[in-house]
Amino acid sequence: KGRTVEIFNSFELLLDPTTQTLDRSFLEKKQELYKKMLNSRIRVLHQYLAAKFNTAYERNTRRGGR
């Protein structure tokens, strides 16, 4: 019986703090690297952001607030 296996992975993206834009060339290089490593097509299914606390409000909110 055949099986379908889905493998998920993630990698970092560079954000220019001045313009608040993603470095597209860095993203494209990472995608090409994964294509070579996995020897198959790669698709971006979802994006998410994991960042340091940027403001006092965010810090307080995540700690339970004050």
From Swiss-Prot:
<comment type="similarity">
    <text>Belongs to the peptidase M67A family. CSN6 subfamily.</text>
</comment>
<dbReference type="GO" id="GO:0008180">
    <property type="term" value="C:COP9 signalosome"/>
</dbReference>
<keyword id="KW-0963">Cytoplasm</keyword>
<comment type="function">
    <text>Component of the COP9 signalosome complex (CSN), a complex involved in various cellular and developmental processes such as photomorphogenesis and auxin and jasmonate responses. The CSN complex is an essential regulator of the ubiquitin (Ubl) conjugation pathway by mediating the deneddylation of the cullin subunits of SCF-type E3 ligase complexes, leading to decrease the Ubl ligase activity of SCF. It is involved in repression of photomorphogenesis in darkness by regulating the activity of COP1-containing Ubl ligase complexes.</text>
</comment>
<keyword id="KW-0217">Developmental protein</keyword>
<protein>
    <recommendedName>
        <fullName>COP9 signalosome complex subunit 6a</fullName>
    </recommendedName>
</protein>
<dbReference type="GO" id="GO:0005737">
    <property type="term" value="C:cytoplasm"/>
</dbReference>
<keyword id="KW-0539">Nucleus</keyword>
<keyword id="KW-0736">Signalosome</keyword>
<dbReference type="GO" id="GO:0009585">
    <property type="term" value="P:red, far-red light phototransduction"/>
</dbReference>
<comment type="subunit">
    <text>Component of the CSN complex, probably composed of CSN1, CSN2, CSN3, CSN4, CSN5 (CSN5A or CSN5B), CSN6 (CSN6A or CSN6B), CSN7 and CSN8.</text>
</comment>
<keyword id="KW-0607">Phytochrome signaling pathway</keyword>
